[in-house]
Amino acid sequence: MGAGSSSYRPKAIYLDIDGRIQKVVFSKYCNSSDIMDLFCIATGLPRNTTISLLTTDDAMVSIDPTMPANSERTPYKVRPVAVKQVSEREELIQGVLAQVAEQFSRAFKINELKAEVANHLAVLEKRVELEGLKVVEIEKCKSDIKKMREELAARNSRTNCPCKYSFLDNKKLTPRRDVPTYPKYLLSPETIEALRKPTFDVWLWEPNEMLSCLEHMYHDLGLVRDFSINPITLRRWLLCVHDNYRNNPFHNFRHCFCVTQMMYSMVWLCGLQEKFSQMDILVLMTAAICHDLDHPGYNNTYQINARTELAVRYNDISPLENHHCAIAFQILARPECNIFASVPPEGFRQIRQGMITLILATDMARHAEIMDSFKEKMENFDYSNEEHLTLLKMILIKCCDISNEVRPMEVAEPWVDCLLEEYFMQSDREKSEGLPVAPFMDRDKVTKATAQIGFIKFVLIPMFETVTKLFPVVEETMLRPLWESREHYEELKQLDDAMKELQKKTESLTSGAPENTTEKNRDAKDSEGHSPPN
């Protein structure tokens, strides 16, 4: 304790009272008035009596906390001091002065205490800072060790494969263990209403806002309630899904949101909750969110022709769609992201099988096969038949996956530019690697109009016409925009063709003028040398 405790040690003064030695003890924080009162009480004098202290050689001693200490052998003598009678005014002044002096004394004592407390706090803060630095270092070490373990695990599980390219990125699969920090946006009634319609403008929203919209859909459809989904786990899962979509021009997280929002709007538009079980709705929504996870931006044709790791792994059978499924269930396998944690094992098996079936159905190579099967069932469609329902769910996710042209033109058309950009990136790479190039992906052969007309005419319209037979409401809301979109691109193609024809004529006239002039000069010379017969 040392110096810290010595400052609080009381002071002892010895008084000689009629030959009797009286010891008086007081703290250094007492003021002069308190000490004088204490001496008066010790000598039997009335309080407030003015007294003086004398040493053994009759020298006067100042009565205050700093007065010199003495011993039993050298006690101070106490002498009352005779004072004149003072007026009431003087007594009042003296009282006020005494109070002021006492306040000053207290103020000085408070300042001293403040200084001591401040010094003590400074010492504690320094200690906390040092301890905090230790914690930071420990956490950094833990993080480094965790990264090293993950890298070692990835290396141990990696198979040596003679593939040309690998698109896997296992680092993304590690979910965030803390509660996701993206802001929880409070959706306005107008946004909630618009979110249920196919006309929703998906370009107006930032990623955090799209995450909040997806979270709202699960609550609004009753999925969080019916399957006891932990809201924090739902947010963490959505954030992990977001992190596992790549920044491709087309196949990115916004496309994921676009497809899921269209599925959500079809649930409300077609009254699907009356036709399907809640588990079916959960499968439809979750498959839509996961259907393009970790898409590398190069389609199945490229994967197969380039003999990539995905093509080899899945034996050229829907390599991308199989990869999307695998990533989806790797994320769900993490306890922190398992939104199906409360679902019984048999229920989870059904959900898993349903999601795999729907995601694999998005492979456009299977389009004709799925459409033919669905048309067969349409003749006697039975909602109680599980096979019929499965085919309908496959058609629904296919509709949502390629539904951009269902939206208003100002929302749909930018997606065409995004898709063509991704196509051109692939065709450029295929040319550089000596691989086959599809004409509809070649930047030298395709235009926006030619890319869309055939797709709308032979894929989109027939598929949505089939769905309209089950849900007539689809015709006005979804089929009519497709007809209008087809007309728009046909007009655009006519304009493109007219411009090309005009360009050809201009080039022909420009390149043919010198030749025609030469021929005319030659004819004139010939006519001069050969006169026509009479």
UniProtKB/Swiss-Prot annotation:
Active-site positions, per UniProt?
251
Q: Provide the assembly information.
A: Homodimer.
Superkingdom as given in the UniProt entry: Eukaryota
The source organism is: Mus musculus
Q: Without the gene, what phenotype results? A: Mice hearts develop less dilation and dysfunction when exposed to sustained pressure overload.
Cofactor descriptive note = Binds 1 Zn(2+) ion per subunit. Binds 2 divalent metal cations per subunit: site 1 preferentially binds zinc, while site 2 has a preference for magnesium. Tightly binds zinc. Binds 1 Mg(2+) ions per subunit. Binds 2 divalent metal cations per subunit: site 1 preferentially binds zinc, while site 2 has a preference for magnesium. Binds magnesium less tightly than zinc.
Q: What class of enzyme is it?
A: hydrolase
Biological processes, Gene Ontology terms: cGMP catabolic process; negative regulation of neural precursor cell proliferation; positive regulation of cardiac muscle hypertrophy; positive regulation of long-term synaptic potentiation; signal transduction
Q: Which residues form a coiled coil?
A: none
Q: Where does Zn(2+) bind?
A: 255, 291-292, 401
Give the matching Gene3D superfamilies.
3'5'-cyclic nucleotide phosphodiesterase, catalytic domain (1.10.1300.10)
Q: Where in the sequence is Phosphoserine found? A: 318
Q: How is its activity regulated?
A: Inhibited by SCH 51866 and moderately, by zaprinast. Specifically inhibited by PF-04447943 (6-[(3S,4S)-4-methyl-1-(pyrimidin-2-ylmethyl)pyrrolidin-3-yl]-1-(tetrahydro-2H-pyran-4-yl)-1,5-dihydro-4H-pyrazolo[3,4-d]pyrimidin-4-one).
Question: Where does the UniProt annotation locate this protein?
Answer: Cell projection, Ruffle membrane; Cytoplasm, Perinuclear region; Golgi apparatus; Endoplasmic reticulum
What does UniProt list as this organism's lineage? Eukaryota, Metazoa, Chordata, Craniata, Vertebrata
PROSITE patterns reported for this sequence: PDEASE_I_1, PDEASE_I_2
Q: Locate the residues binding Mg(2+).
A: 292
List the Gene Ontology MF annotations in alphabetical order.
3',5'-cyclic-GMP phosphodiesterase activity; metal ion binding
User: Which protein is depicted?
Assistant: High affinity cGMP-specific 3',5'-cyclic phosphodiesterase 9A
Where do the segments described as Disordered lie?
500-534
- Encoding gene (name): Pde9a
Q: Which UniProt keywords apply?
A: Cell membrane, Cell projection, cGMP, Cytoplasm, Endoplasmic reticulum, Golgi apparatus, Hydrolase, Magnesium, Membrane, Metal-binding, Phosphoprotein, Zinc
Q: Which family does it belong to?
A: Belongs to the cyclic nucleotide phosphodiesterase family. PDE9 subfamily.
Q: Which cofactor does this sequence's record say it needs?
A: Zn(2+); Mg(2+)
Basic and acidic residues bias located where? 517-534
A GO cellular component entry from the record: perikaryon
Q: Could you tell me which pathway this protein works in?
A: Purine metabolism; 3',5'-cyclic GMP degradation; GMP from 3',5'-cyclic GMP: step 1/1
